[in-house]
Amino acid sequence: MHNNFYQEDELLNNELSNRGVLLTKVDDVIGWARSNSLWPMTFGLACCAVEMMQAAASRYDMDRFGMLFRPSPRQSDLMIVAGTLTNKMAPALRKVYDQMAEPKWVLSMGSCANGGGYYHFSYSVVRGCDRIVPVDVYVPGCPPTAEALIYGLMQLQKKIKRTTGFKYDARKNH
């Protein structure tokens, strides 16, 4: 009985694909669209921001991954925290993060953003931006190369594709 069902299902799929019809899950389509159309907002705080600019320039060309830098948090779904986060700047980071629309992701770039880095023991430095905002991907290095940033972005794309469920609460965003 089960064998017959799977054979009929396979025949139907083959017949539809011959007619140019694609069968897939909504979660897969949403994951594909979200991962290939990230709009990052820069939060460049130190020297890591220079490497982020290099990754966006013509040699590495982040646009080919569907990424378009946006100046406003309301138009962004990815925040790249690049550099040393100080105690004075932490509330601004949280405020900008809260202004971003759902779904949103954070990439922590460099040793200083990941854990305080060279300034870890300074009284004025936050020991990792994950104490202020939830971080999805960490890119190590001081400063990390443009290749490392692009690799981190590719890992984030994989993570987004694995995310299931179309979660949207109109009451929360209204």
From Swiss-Prot:
GO MF terms held by the record: 4 iron, 4 sulfur cluster binding; iron ion binding; NADH dehydrogenase (ubiquinone) activity; NADH:ubiquinone reductase (non-electrogenic) activity; quinone binding
Residues annotated as binding [4Fe-4S] cluster: 47-48, 112, 142
CC per GO annotation: plasma membrane; respiratory chain complex I
Top-level class of the enzyme under EC nomenclature: translocase
Name of the gene encoding the protein in the UniProt record: nuoB
Its job: NDH-1 shuttles electrons from NADH, via FMN and iron-sulfur (Fe-S) centers, to quinones in the respiratory chain. Couples the redox reaction to proton translocation (for every two electrons transferred, four hydrogen ions are translocated across the cytoplasmic membrane), and thus conserves the redox energy in a proton gradient.
HAMAP family: NDH1_NuoB
Protein name: NADH-quinone oxidoreductase subunit B
Domain of life: Bacteria
Subunit note: NDH-1 is composed of 14 different subunits. Subunits NuoB, C, D, E, F, and G constitute the peripheral sector of the complex.
Subcellular location: Cell inner membrane
Keyword annotations: 4Fe-4S, Cell inner membrane, Cell membrane, Iron, Iron-sulfur, Membrane, Metal-binding, NAD, Quinone, Translocase, Transport, Ubiquinone
Enzyme Commission designation: 7.1.1.-
Cofactor note: Binds 1 [4Fe-4S] cluster.
Main location: membrane
Species of provenance: Rickettsia bellii (strain RML369-C)
GO biological process per UniProt: aerobic respiration; electron transport coupled proton transport
Cofactors: [4Fe-4S] cluster
Family, similarity comment: Belongs to the complex I 20 kDa subunit family.
Catalysed reaction, written as an equation: a quinone + NADH + 5 H(+)(in) = a quinol + NAD(+) + 4 H(+)(out)
Record membrane topology: Peripheral membrane protein
